[in-house]
Amino acid sequence: MVSVYLLANFGGPRHASDIEVFLTSLLTDRDVTGKFLPPFIHKRLFSFIAKKRVAKVLPQYNCIGGFSPIYRDTEDLADTLSLYLDAPVITFHRYLPDTHQLTVQRLKAFGDCPVIGVPLFPHFTYSVTGSIVRFIHAHLPLLNISWISHFGNHPQFIFCMIDHILKFLQSHDISIHDCCLLFSAHGLPMRYINKGDPYNKHCEKSFKTISERLPNIETHLCYQSKFGPGRWLTPSTKDVCETLKTDKTYVLIVPFGFTSDHIETLYEIEKEYIPILKAREYRALRVPAIYQSPEWAASLATIIQSTPRAEKESLIKP
């Protein structure tokens, strides 16, 4: 029996009218923003916050072309993966609710075929990968599905990341001896880490492996995109950009954990962090997300075919 693959990603606004719907879907997800309020109050509060945030983020999306490329990138990647895997690849965009019905219908159409879920996040967190798993099992409880929970330390991911970075350096005529790399991952509240979320450990292990294979390059791990009050993982990317002391001419920010470019890379890194470094007289550049690597689709196919599967029980936080 043929396997079916479910390629799951964050989703992102395809146009301006998607922004409020996207933010509402994201912020009302209790796996993301927490379970400290009763569900009905949580939904009302974060729906209000999402509506208020539109005015802030709309100019940011306008600055990067009016949309997020993550939707199109995921669809294109699914088409390419289908050729490598010689099997159907269905997409799931977690925070684009008007796409969910089609995903569910397409999965149902394959009946009892085994499904392999592939969230496009190298490092596991209950807040993102766990949310995807929870959603699919809630809407398709009888689906015969297992999951690739993370792949940030898979040899093929490590190879592809290093190859992508070195080719970027070569294309910009930058010596490995004269650059510093800031690996910027999405942040996470410390209250989640303190409750056992393994995200930071996965990030640190992946970063350590890559750094060991780049022995002649100065590297730092940092975290971006803090939202709301409370302590988050540190150091923050902004703080590192403001306080970094290196004798290297070039400082490159590498999206780490972001497999596709979207507002966190195209705006937050490019328009907020890169200027900080340039103001401090570093030659600063943003490395594109790994999706831009010509090796990525083939590498991901290898990762999918060689990674042990996980069941939902280990991926969902009660």
From Swiss-Prot:
GO terms under biological process: heme biosynthetic process
Can the keyword Iron be found in this entry's annotation?
A: yes
Provide the reaction this enzyme catalyses.
heme b + 2 H(+) = protoporphyrin IX + Fe(2+)
Which Pfam families does this chain map to?
A: Ferrochelatase
Part of which pathway?
Answer: Porphyrin-containing compound metabolism; protoheme biosynthesis; protoheme from protoporphyrin-IX: step 1/1
Regarding protein family, the annotation reads: Belongs to the ferrochelatase family.
What this protein is called in its record is Ferrochelatase
Species assigned in the record: Chlamydia felis (strain Fe/C-56) (Chlamydophila felis)
Query: Gene of origin?
Result: hemH
